[in-house]
Structures are given as C-alpha cells and as structure tokens.
Amino acid sequence: MHEYSIVTALIEECERHAFANNASKVSRVEIKLGILSGVEPELLRTAFETFKLEGICREANLVMNIQPLVLRCLDCGQSTEHSERSVICSHCQSGQTKVLDGEDMMLMQLELEQA
C-alpha cells in the first residue's frame, strides 16, 4: 500500500510548514487528489487517521477534493472534464488527447494554530 508512504510524506510536509510558522498544531489539511493519481481516497484517509495519532497533526481533519480528469483533444482542440478514467475526447471521440489535470496529489491548504 503506497498510501502509507504518501501519508508519511504528507505529514512530514505539514510538520515542516507548521514549524516554519511557529504553529503548535495543524487543525486542517486540504489536498487535491486527481482521479488518475493512483491513490485510493479511502486508503489514504485510513492511513492519515493512523499516522496522525502522534505529533502536530494529531487533531487535523483531512479534506480531500477529488480532481476530475481534464483533457485537451489534440484533434478538435476541446478541453473537457471526465469523472471517470477515460482519455477519449467526449466531444469527437478521438484518442489523441493530452492530460491537463487530474494526475496529481497536491497539498493545497493548511490551517495552523499557534499556542
């Protein structure tokens, strides 16, 4: 389960930002999770709840915003959003597409509290 290593890195990044801003705790962690990121949201949530138990993130709430797949068709030029994992242009049915968004996981926002 690579979600464990991803959560470990996420918590380390949260801690780095918290310490850099003299925060005593992290209360909210917001991430963007692309549907093609290869990360399973429920496994990620379980891993986060497990690994946050010690440290500055122990009371943090994880907010996951699922990012749809955004494609640009190289044939017709249309940009479209897809909620499923399909790289076919929904406008002209071409397979010649470029992924613009929906492949990544990103830390978007932290809510920090100071003592």
UniProtKB/Swiss-Prot annotation:
InterPro entries xrefs: HypA/HybF (IPR000688)
Keywords recorded for this protein, A-Z: Metal-binding, Nickel, Zinc
One Pfam family in the UniProt entry: HypA
Keyword check for Signal: no
Gene Ontology molecular function, alphabetical: nickel cation binding; zinc ion binding
Binding site for Ni(2+): H2
GO BP of this protein: protein maturation; protein modification process
Residues noted as binding Zn(2+) in the record, renumbered to the chain: C73, C76, C89, C92
Protein task: Involved in the maturation of [NiFe] hydrogenases. Required for nickel insertion into the metal center of the hydrogenase.
Assigned protein family: Belongs to the HypA/HybF family.
Alphabetical list of HAMAP family matching this protein: HypA_HybF (MF_00213)
Name of the protein in question: Hydrogenase maturation factor HypA
Source organism of this protein record: Shewanella halifaxensis (strain HAW-EB4)
Gene coding for it: hypA
